[in-house]
Amino acid sequence: MGRNDEERLTADIIELARQYGRYGYRKIAALLRSTAGWVVNDKRVERIWRREGLKVPAKQPKRGRLWLNDGSCVRLRAEYPNHVWSYDFVEDRTHDGRKYRMLNVVDEFTHEALEIRISRRLKSADVIDVLSDLFILRGVPGHIRSDNGPEFVAKAVQEWIGAVGAKTAYILPGSPWENGFIESFNARLRDELLDGAIFYSLAEARIIVESWRRHYNTVRPHQSLGYKPPAPEVFIPVMGARSAPQPRPAAPTALAPKPILH
């Protein structure tokens, strides 16, 4: 590698480190290979990383999660795509101090973020609405894992999920580590986006969060997936052009009608 190549590589590393401030050198190396066309190993990136004084900012203590490395806390393990989904709520505020909620849905096997629905208020009817849209696009999963929040344990939600052929998997109360996949996703969302972003409107939040979700699925290297993104074939990001949706799995022939909630 000549001097000019070394300088260009260094510039690309610095730019990616600036753009993705929570990524370490291994994720940056994976991005260099997958999106920038570099043929470079982790050791060279690490050497430049250290020479330039780059580092991942220390996490705030409140981001810590209880998690067992062997996964022994997770009683139901996903064995194939659409086997187990998990979902959970995350709350944040726009610049004016008003609260909004996000309903996050993740496929535990592929690690793909299937949906992030954002609204000022999200109730059990919205849970059914989100799942209905996803079932049509993706098919019905075997199980849906969640905590015991009122929106998830609502009778209408349980009956509707059962009617379409899926099963609910509720974690023990006060045991968020049993929902480790979605908890980890929520932590990444906060760490990589929400903690450093100010949204002046709900519309802005929806646009930026959706952009982050697509990046998370199609570009972001995942250590647990060998530093590859979970779903590069779903959306192909093109600079300056709108991403083109790719074929989805066959939709179920029919879904149970949505219940009328009062």
Predicted regions and their residues:
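Basic, flexible linker segments flanking DNA-binding modules
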Residues: M1-V84, S175, P229-G240
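RNase H-like two-metal-ion nuclease catalytic core shared by retroviral integrases
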Residues: G2-N4, S146-W160, T168-D191, S201-E210, ...
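Mobile genetic element proteins and their domesticated derivatives, centered on retroelements
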Residues: I13, I28, V45, W49, ...
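Residue-level detection of the helix-turn-helix DNA-binding "recognition helix"
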Residues: R33, R50, L54, G162, ...
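Mobile-element integrase/transposase regions
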Residues: W38-V106, E112, A125-V130, L137-G142, ...
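Hydrophobic beta-strand scaffold residues
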Residues: V56, K167-T168
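C-terminal domain-tail junction helix/linker
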Residues: V164, A187-H262
